């Protein structure tokens, strides 16, 4: 597995943890779902924060690179969970964001 694939996989798991941690409260507040869903939401957000610490880069650089993968995972969530068809604009935005992530994540180490 290449370094880029490892980084992208860790970012994808991190993004999923963040999305679940934010989606569950949304279900409680907007969808009238049970309040106990806030417990797994909090655990998911704690997992998200911990996963961010596994990256070797400085925190700001990690967050910047992570943003590209987050966009792609959020669009997959939009399609799979929300059932919304993606547009070519969604795809183009995801490609650009992932390209930015690769530039930031794979820069030469000083």
From Swiss-Prot:
The chain crosses the membrane at residues 9-29, 34-54, 66-86, 88-108. InterPro entries: UPF0060 (IPR003844). GO terms for cellular component: plasma membrane. Keywords: Cell inner membrane, Cell membrane, Membrane, Transmembrane, Transmembrane helix. The keyword Lipoprotein does not apply. It is found in: Cell inner membrane. The keyword Disulfide bond does not apply. It is a multi-pass membrane protein. It comes from the Bacteria. HAMAP family: UPF0060. Belongs to the UPF0060 family. This is UPF0060 membrane protein BamMC406_1172.
């Amino acid at each position: 597995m290449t370094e880029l694939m490892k980084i992208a996989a860790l970012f994808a798991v991190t993004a999923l943890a963040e999305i679940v941690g934010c989606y569950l409260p949304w279900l409680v507040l907007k969808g009238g779902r049970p309040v106990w869903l806030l417990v797994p939401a909090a655990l998911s957000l704690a997992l998200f924060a911990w996963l961010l610490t596994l990256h070797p880069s400085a925190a700001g650089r990690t967050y910047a690179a992570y943003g590209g993968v987050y966009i792609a995972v959020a669009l997959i969530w939009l399609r799979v969970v929300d059932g919304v068809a993606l547009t070519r604009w969604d795809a183009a935005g995801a490609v650009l964001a992932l390209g930015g992530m690769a530039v930031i994540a794979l820069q030469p180490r000083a």
